[in-house]
Structure formats: structure tokens, C-alpha cells
Design a protein with these regions (language model features):
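Generic structural signal for beta-strand residues in well-ordered domains
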Residues: 1, 9, 32, 194-197
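Local sequence-structure signature of Cys/Sec-based thiol-disulfide redox active-site neighborhoods
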Residues: 2-28, 42
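Short, well-ordered coil/turn elements that cap or connect secondary structure elements
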Residues: 3, 34-36, 287
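Flexible, glycine-rich phosphate/dinucleotide-binding loops
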Residues: 17, 48, 213
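Structural alpha/beta surface segment adjacent to cysteine/selenocysteine redox centers
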Residues: 21-128, 266-269
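C-terminal cap of thioredoxin/glutaredoxin-like
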Residues: 23-30, 112-301
Length: 302
């Protein structure tokens, strides 16, 4: 199987509400370009321990603000504690190394459970996510403790804390000082020592992966750290691979849900359709089943 013309290195973390809110952009790219783009997940690991300076009420306030801003299914009820993300990130890296075809499903299930109120450092949450993602629960738990998994996880973390020169040049919104505390996953970036930076979530490194057409000189790499509108990614892809074809917009919300194969939020369906949320909500109500979470919820075909 030949490589796709474009590779996107996706730096993210299952605990980050900004990354969760940006899933609509990623889904739109998947719809438009499909297998013309390859994706690599890299875990940032926003937190390794429970942050003492970021209490649950502060997390609840941040979740509420983002849920109202972007309409994603985020339950902002106050948690009993702020859960560090390292165990979930380790489980994702373990999945990548042994069951790479289930990595995206595992990330999705961890996000859905986390933003519905579950705790990412709880063994029950990790087991439920693994089961829902079609993974062997006990085997994954044992494999996650392997030295190979820990080494790969630390490699991800080093990469996330070594932003490119191009990303540093854009350091007005996509980088942070690298201290792994939860507050830095939910508030806009701040300034810090130049030598101490890390990617916020999501951050994309987009690379030309195959030789460009002889008569079409293209860019070789475009880095877009931090939360961006989908148009920024489309422009980068056009510069990297102008020969890519774009799939027409979907004809219906049913087409989107059938294509996705997983329950989607209203905002995600709207983004794939290139419409506003009120424009798709009525059609979704007539065509799909709904599971409420926070200010929105998830739609699926019956």
C-alpha cells in the first residue's frame, strides 16, 4: 500500500477540552481527504500527578466555559479530584504499539468517558474505554506496564516538549511552558522562558510524505500549534499537496453518521457538513437517536 501524500503528526491528550472541542476540525479533514492523509498520534501528557494549584472547582469552571463556547458534550459537574492524564496516555501508547488499528477508537472512548464525568486515572475508566474500543482489557493492562511502552510514552513527551522552530515563531497561542499541570490544558497559553516550551493540544505538524508532482513545487512541512480553525489546516494541506481531491459535502446527516461509525456531537456533524449547529439539529432529531451529555450529547443511527 502506497503512502499518503500528507502525514499529520497530531499532538494531543485525552484530558484536554480544547483538543476535544477541536475534533470537529479533524473530522472535517477526514471527510474531505480520507486516505490521502496519514495520521500519527503523539501523547503530550498534560499531567503526571494531581495538581495542587488546580482544584476541581477551577476545572469545572473551565469545562463550563468551553462547553458553552463550542457546544461540545462536556459535563461540567465538579469532579472529586482533578485526574492526571498519564495513565490514559500510557494506555493509548500501549494500544498503538500492539493494536494500532484500535488507537483512534481508544482515544475517542477515553475522551467521551472523561468529559461525561469519569476520571482518567481510574482503572474502571480505562477498562471501560478498552472494552468499548474492542481491546482485550486484561492484556492491555498488563502490556501498559511494559518497559517498551514507557519508553515510547517518554519519547512522545519529549517530542511534545521540543516544538519546531516554525512553531516557536508562532508562539502566541500554541505553546506553553512544559510543567505538566492540568491548568495548562484548559487556559490559553502564557509566556515563559524561551527554552521551556511544549505544544498545547491539539497541535499539528503537517508533512509532505511523497514526492510532489514534477511541475508543482510544494512546501515540505507546515506546523500549526494550538487550536486552529479548519481553514488553516485546509490552507496548509493545499500548500503541501495541491493535487489532493476534496470529497463533496455530505448530502445528509445520516450520511455523516453512517460514515463515522461512532456517535457524534451536534458540533461535529455540523462541521463535517460545513453547516452551523442549528442547521443540522432538526435533521438529526428526525433521523437519529440522542444521548445527552452536558449542553449537547451524541447522535447515532438507530
Amino acid at each position: 500500500m502506497s503512502a499518503a501524500p500528507v502525514l499529520i503528526r497530531h499532538y494531543t491528550d485525552p484530558s484536554c477540552p480544547w483538543a476535544f472541542s477541536a475534533e470537529r476540525q479533524r473530522l472535517r479533514l477526514l471527510w474531505l481527504y480520507g486516505e490521502q492523509i496519514d495520521w500519527e498520534l503523539h501523547m503530550v501528557v498534560l499531567s503526571e500527578t494531581v495538581p495542587e494549584d488546580f482544584p476541581p472547582e477551577r476545572l469545572s469552571h473551565a469545562y463550563r466555559r468551553l462547553a458553552l463556547m463550542y457546544g461540545m458534550p462536556i459535563d461540567w459537574s465538579e469532579r472529586v479530584r482533578v485526574a492526571p492524564s498519564i495513565r490514559a496516555c500510557r494506555a493509548l501508547v500501549a494500544t498503538r504499539l500492539r493494536w494500532p488499528e484500535r488507537e483512534a477508537a481508544m482515544l475517542r472512548r477515553l475522551r467521551v468517558l472523561n468529559f461525561a464525568g469519569e476520571l482518567l486515572d481510574d482503572s474502571d475508566t480505562l477498562e471501560h474505554a478498552a472494552e468499548q474500543a474492542g481491546l482485550p482489557v486484561a492484556e492491555l493492562a498488563a502490556w501498559a506496564d511494559a518497559p517498551e511502552v514507557e519508553a515510547a510514552l517518554r519519547e512522545d513527551m519529549v517530542g511534545a516538549r521540543s516544538p519546531s522552530p516554525a512553531s516557536r515563531a508562532q508562539d502566541s497561542g500554541g505553546l506553553r511552558p512544559p510543567s505538566p499541570d492540568a491548568s495548562r490544558s484548559v487556559y490559553p497559553p502564557v509566556t515563559g522562558p524561551e527554552e521551556e516550551r511544549r505544544y498545547t493540544c491539539p497541535s499539528y505538524e503537517l508533512l509532505r510524505a511523497t514526492p510532489p508532482p514534477a511541475d508543482w513545487p510544494t512546501a515540505q512541512r507546515v506546523d500549526l500549534p494550538g487550536f486552529r480553525p479548519v481553514e488553516a489546516y485546509e490552507a496548509a494541506i493545499a500548500n503541501l499537496a495541491p493535487e489532493l481531491t476534496r470529497r463533496p459535502d455530505p448530502a445528509s446527516v445520516q450520511e455523516v453518521l453512517a460514515w463515522a461509525g461512532i456517535p457524534l456531537a451536534t458540533a461535529e456533524v455540523a462541521a463535517v457538513c460545513d453547516l452551523e449547529q442549528p442547521e443540522v439539529r432538526g435533521e438529526l432529531a428526525r433521523a437519529a437517536a440522542f444521548e445527552p451529555v452536558g449542553v449537547d450529547g451524541y447522535w447515532s443511527l438507530g
